[in-house]
A protein has these predicted regions:
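Alpha-helical membrane segments of multi-pass proteins
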Residues: 1-208
C-alpha cells in the first residue's frame, strides 16, 4: 500500500505542486538540460523505472535490500529519482520543453501499465511466504490476514493503484488533447496546413 501511494500518487502530485517557473529555473536550465535530456528520455525512463521496481519487488532481492539500512536508503533514492523522471514524461510540466505529443504519451501510459503486470500477477498467485521480516507480525492488525494473504493483497493493491493513477492521468490527457484539436479547428499554421473537423488539409502557399 505504501509503495503504491509513494510511486503512483505522491510522485505526480509532487511534480504538479512545483511552480513552472521553479522548474524552469532550478530543474531544467542550461546547466542541467543536457544531462536531463538523457536521464529523462521517454523510453529510457519507462524501462528504467519499471525494470528497477520489478527487480526490487522480487522477494530474494527485496529481502537482501532490507537487511541493510544503507542499501535500503540508496535503493529508495534511486527509485525516487527514476519515478520522478517517468512521471515527468507523462505530465510534461514545462510546456516549451519538447516532449511526447498526446498520442505518444497515451501509448507511454499504456505500456507503463503493462510493465508491472508480471510481478503484480506473481504476488497475486503466490502460495508461500517469501518475506521473513513480516512473518513475525502477521495477523496483528487483521487476524485473518496471514502473510500469504498479505502478499497477495499487496500485489492486487499495486496493480489497482497503478491502473487507477494511470487511468486518471490518461483521461486528463485525452481531455487536453481534445481541447487542443478544438482550438486548431479552422486554423492555418505556418506550414500551410488547415484543420477542419479533425481533417488535415494541405494548402498551396499561394492560396494561403
Amino acid at each position: 500500500m505504501q509503495l503504491s501511494v509513494v510511486f503512483f500518487i505522491s510522485r505526480p502530485l509532487l511534480i504538479l505542486s512545483l511552480p513552472v517557473n521553479f522548474l524552469r529555473q532550478y530543474i531544467w536550465n542550461h546547466r542541467t538540460k543536457f544531462a536531463l535530456n538523457i536521464l529523462a528520455h521517454p523510453w529510457l525512463t519507462l524501462i528504467t523505472f519499471n525494470g528497477l521496481l520489478t527487480i526490487y519487488l522480487i522477494p530474494a532481492v527485496f529481502n537482501i535490500i532490507h537487511t541493510n539500512i544503507f542499501l535500503s536508503i540508496i535503493t529508495q533514492a534511486i527509485l525516487f529519482v527514476s519515478a520522478i523522471f517517468m512521471w515527468w514524461v507523462i505530465i510534461h510540466p514545462v510546456p516549451e520543453i519538447k516532449g511526447l505529443d498526446y498520442l505518444l504519451r497515451a501509448l507511454y501510459i499504456f505500456l507503463a501499465s503493462l510493465a508491472l503486470f508480471p510481478i503484480g500477477f506473481y504476488y497475486v498467485i503466490i502460495q508461500s511466504a517469501h518475506f521473513p521480516v513480516y512473518i513475525p507480525v502477521e495477523r496483528e492488525l487483521i487476524h485473518s490476514l496471514s502473510s500469504i494473504y498479505d502478499q497477495q493483497l499487496a500485489g492486487g493493491i499495486l496493480k489497482v493503484m497503478q491502473l487507477a493513477s494511470y487511468s486518471f492521468v490518461l483521461l486528463i490527457l485525452l481531455f487536453k488533447w481534445g481541447k487542443q484539436e478544438e482550438a486548431k479547428e479552422g486554423s492555418v499554421d505556418e506550414e500551410h496546413i488547415r484543420y477542419a473537423r479533425g481533417v488535415v488539409i494541405h494548402l498551396d502557399k499561394e492560396k494561403k
